[in-house]
Design a protein with these regions (language model features):
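A structural detector for beta-sheet-dominated domains
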Residues: 50, 64-65, 129, 157-159, ...
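Assembly/interface hotspot detector across virion components, adhesins/toxins, and nucleic-acid enzymes
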Residues: 33-36, 52, 156, 179-185
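Short, flexible coil/linker elements and helix-boundary hinge sites characteristic
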Residues: 17-20, 73, 123, 150-156, ...
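Acidic, glycine-rich flexible loop segments
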Residues: 125-177
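C-terminal, beta-strand-rich globular interaction domains
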Residues: 163-210
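Extended, low-hydrophobicity segments enriched in charged/polar residues
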Residues: 1-145
């Protein structure tokens, strides 16, 4: 388990705590774990949970100032989606390998937050603790195939003008996949993601269709 794995374990544990604690005024404490990211002055973190209606829904974090628009009843779904898209405008990310890794974790958070119906297709299982691999859908009762027991570790590589983040994960309709994306900072520290790729290392389809 490397340092990225360890931070991933902490991140998932914190996610589950935040989802389960509806009494919290804000979700700002996520950045006690993602400690290479901080909110800009006056900003707070909120969490919109998937609604169990319609053909599918997902959950996401968003930022706000003043009162939480979801709690005071002034938010609509499109407003929260817009806040989600621009969440990094209200965050300061350290330009380090660990900062890039934590930005990736936040970027992928909808895939580990609660999902409803068709949105389950985006769900991921991460293997920050390699023992978790034995608990995923196809291998609960069957041995893990030898060729995928050696799962690549998460990694972050710094290039001249960007970071490359790679992370293995499992999806019940793709199999074992290696995520790869580029993360860049402009001269003002604003962050952007591009060249997002998913390479299938071991193909699997659960057969479940929504």
């Amino acid at each position: 388990m490397n340092n990225y794995d360890k931070k991933g374990v902490e991140f998932l544990a914190k996610i589950y705590d935040l989802v389960g604690d509806e009494e919290l005024d804000t979700k700002d404490s996520l950045f006690e774990v993602l400690d290479q990211i901080r909110l800009k002055d006056g900003c707070h973190l909120g969490l919109r949970l998937a609604e169990k209606k319609g053909m599918g829904d997902n959950s996401w974090f968003y930022t706000y100032t003043g009162e939480d628009p979801l709690k005071n009843g002034t938010a609509d779904i499109e407003m929260l989606r817009e806040k989600r898209r621009h969440i990094y405008d209200d965050l300061i990310v350290e330009q380090t390998n660990m900062g890039a890794w934590q930005a990736y974790l936040l970027f992928l958070s909808p895939s580990v937050l609660p999902l409803w119906w068709h949105e389950n297709y985006i769900g991921r299982t991460f293997f920050f603790d390699r023992e978790n691999f034995k608990g995923i859908f196809p291998f609960r009762c069957e041995p893990v195939p030898l060729k995928i027991q050696d799962i690549p570790e998460p990694s972050v590589t710094k290039r001249k003008d960007h970071f490359i983040v790679r992370c293995p994960n499992w999806n019940d309709w793709e199999g074992l996949v290696l995520d790869s994306l580029n993360l860049s900072f402009d001269e003002d520290g604003n962050i952007s993601f591009d060249n997002f790729k998913r390479k299938v290392l071991y193909e699997f389809h659960s057969g479940i269709c929504f």
